[in-house]
UniProtKB/Swiss-Prot annotation:
Membrane topology: Peripheral membrane protein
Keyword Nucleotide-binding in record: yes
Known catalytic reactions: L-methionine(out) + ATP + H2O = L-methionine(in) + ADP + phosphate + H(+); D-methionine(out) + ATP + H2O = D-methionine(in) + ADP + phosphate + H(+)
Function according to Swiss-Prot or TrEMBL: Part of the ABC transporter complex MetNIQ involved in methionine import. Responsible for energy coupling to the transport system.
Disulfide feature: none
Database matches in CDD domains: ABC_MetN_methionine_transporter
SMART domains named in the record: AAA, NIL
UniProt organism field: Streptococcus thermophilus (strain CNRZ 1066)
Pfam family, one: NIL
Record PANTHER family: AMINO ACID IMPORT ATP-BINDING PROTEIN (PTHR43166), METHIONINE IMPORT ATP-BINDING PROTEIN METN (PTHR43166:SF30)
Domain ABC transporter: start-end pairs: 8-250
The protein's name: Methionine import ATP-binding protein MetN
Length: 355
């Protein structure tokens, strides 16, 4: 039995506006497995939200095939389920949004209850479930509060409880932390991770922030102009991006872009000696354990001056990055660069000293 819960094959989504054809999604194929926290990242207009509307059964693709769980939902531009089956399938997918979409005149309790209005549960069972969900998102004491009495993070917790009311297998987060401050964002991401573990929930994160992908996801797809640029494990994508846009996202998340701007403004780098190189090193896994700069000084007499360093854990794997000035005899520096690459460290020369 397949572990794939969302299977998109060659999805096209086309719109016609004022006699103009717009292809919002172009030949996208993605497989998401049960229990994944899967990120779909891209800038505005990349096609992320349009693709999600097809996943949550609100948008019929122009072409391609979508399978949710064991059921083919759309194929070749046609709905493959009856109206009743489609409605039942939608209940297996929960959704949270950037602006919460809570009803202002209803309490937190009533907002969650609204999702159960068609449930066959008794009133007593509904009450137990609603209070259990509010406790699950750490809002048991806020049941009678209205949205205006809640913080942004608390509103999103109510929205999450509401999205879980019908016991979905999949939870889609469409920019759900974009309106939150950094501290609250981390709290919501932590909650989603907990729900993923406790409930076996498959989470799909739609975002334009690679930091969110890095913090919570195990796999990621990068989209641009409706197309899938690259897809893979977060570790693989972060340690070895294949596309310029992906590299741009990663540099933004790591803060390396700002760091490089400051490094390049330093007198040492502005006036880099002829014998020196400014290099960027990327370490993955066990290669982070080696004292490489100590080794190349010992073996080649090449000094390493660290200007920037960062180590993070992606999954269970450490990923490190250094920006260093290597200085020494030219033939020794070349030998040191080869030794670094042979150690499994990715290397990029950022600047050569003035000759």
């Amino acid at each position: 039995m397949s572990n794939v819960i969302i299977d998109l094959k060659n999805i096209d989504i086309t719109f016609t506006q004022k006699r103009r054809t717009i292809q919002a999604v172009k030949d996208v194929s993605i497989q998401i497995e049960k229990g994944d926290i899967y990120g779909i990242v891209g800038y505005s207009g990349a096609g992320k939200s349009t693709l999600v509307r097809a996943i949550n059964l609100l948008q019929v693709p122009t072409a391609g095939k979508i399978t949710i769980g064991e059921d083919v939902t759309f194929e070749n531009g046609q709905v493959q389920l009856t109206t009743k089956e489609l409605r039942q399938k939608r209940q297996t997918i929960g959704m949270i949004f950037q602006h919460f979409n809570l009803m202002a005149q209803k309490t937190a309790y009533e907002n969650v209850a609204f999702a159960l209005r068609h449930s066959k549960l008794s009133n007593e069972e509904k009450d137990k479930k609603i209070r259990g969900l509010l406790e699950l998102v750490d809002l048991a004491d806020r049941a009678e509060n209205y949205p205006a009495q809640l913080s942004g993070g608390q509103k999103q917790r109510v929205a999450i409880a509401r999205a879980l009311a019908n016991d979905p297998e999949i939870l889609i987060s469409d920019e759900s932390t974009s309106a939150l401050d950094p501290k609250t964002t981390k709290q919501i991401l932590s909650l989603l991770q907990d729900l993923n573990k406790k409930l076996g929930l498959t989470v799909v994160m739609i975002t334009h922030e690679m930091q969110i992908v890095k913090d919570i996801c195990n796999r990621v797809a990068v989209m641009q102009n409706g197309q899938l640029l690259e897809e893979g494990s977060v570790l693989d994508i972060f340690s070895n991006p294949q596309e310029d846009l992906t590299q741009e996202f990663i540099e933004t998340a790591a803060g390396i872009e700002d760091a490089l701007a400051k490094i390049n403004a330093q007198p040492l780098v502005k006036n880099l000696p002829a014998s020196a190189l400014l290099v960027q090193l990327k370490y993955v896994g066990s290669s982070t354990d080696r004292p490489l700069l100590t080794e190349i000084f010992k073996d080649f007499g090449v000094s390493g001056n660290i200007l920037y360093g960062n180590v993070e854990i992606l999954g269970d794997t450490p990923v490190g990055e250094l920006v260093v000035v290597l200085d020494g005899d030219s033939d020794k520096v070349i030998a040191a660069l080869k030794a670094i690459e042979n150690a499994g460290v990715s290397l990029r020369v950022l600047k050569k000293g003035a000759q």
